[in-house]
Amino acid sequence: MRCPKCQHNKSNVIDSRQAEDGNTIRRRRECDACHARFTTFERVEEVPLLVVKKDGTREQFSRDKIFNGILMSAQKRPVSSEDIENAITRIEQNIRRNHDGEVDSEVIGNLVMKELADLDEITYVRFASVYRSFKDVDEIEELLQEITKTVRAKKESKK
């Protein structure tokens, strides 16, 4: 593993443990040359997932694309990067479990919306307003009524 500081290609593993998602190994390393410490992550290389877009084209599944979409919707909201990463991990696991190498972009969008509904209502509404491409205010109002019912039901179940 190449050191990010001096580019030397020899390092020693100081600590190794399983990351929270259970699918990744987190390793602390120390460079043999400059003694800088850095973290690496190791995960199993899985069969690539292909996303089938609305126009029929296919592209490789991208965690970064989902992360950036959620991050934009979560600006100035109490949603951490870790929350987003965990949600994306659940989405990807769901897709790998239930689809054979290809998944429609609509399925991914719906899974993201489901995760965001549980994570933060405002982030959910922001994401939905872009994802669903609302045509008028009435469609937004329907979404707000839907999320309001869900939030009230959650509050009632906690009592």
Curated annotation (Swiss-Prot):
Gene Ontology biological-process entries: negative regulation of DNA-templated transcription
Region (Disordered) location: 1-21
Any one GO MF annotation of this record: DNA binding
Protein's UniProt keywords contain Transcription: yes
Keywords, in A-Z order: ATP-binding, DNA-binding, Metal-binding, Nucleotide-binding, Repressor, Transcription, Transcription regulation, Zinc, Zinc-finger
Residue ranges annotated for the ATP-cone domain, each copy included: 49-139
InterPro entries in alphabetical order: ATP-cone_dom, NrdR-like_N, RNR_NrdR-like
Co-factor: note: Binds 1 zinc ion.
Cofactor(s) essential for the protein: Zn(2+)
First and last residues of each zinc finger (unnamed): 3-34
Family designation: Belongs to the NrdR family.
NCBIfam families, alphabetized: transcriptional regulator NrdR
The protein's role, per its UniProt record: Negatively regulates transcription of bacterial ribonucleotide reductase nrd genes and operons by binding to NrdR-boxes.
The protein, known as: Transcriptional repressor NrdR
Species of the source: Streptococcus thermophilus (strain ATCC BAA-250 / LMG 18311)
Originating gene: nrdR
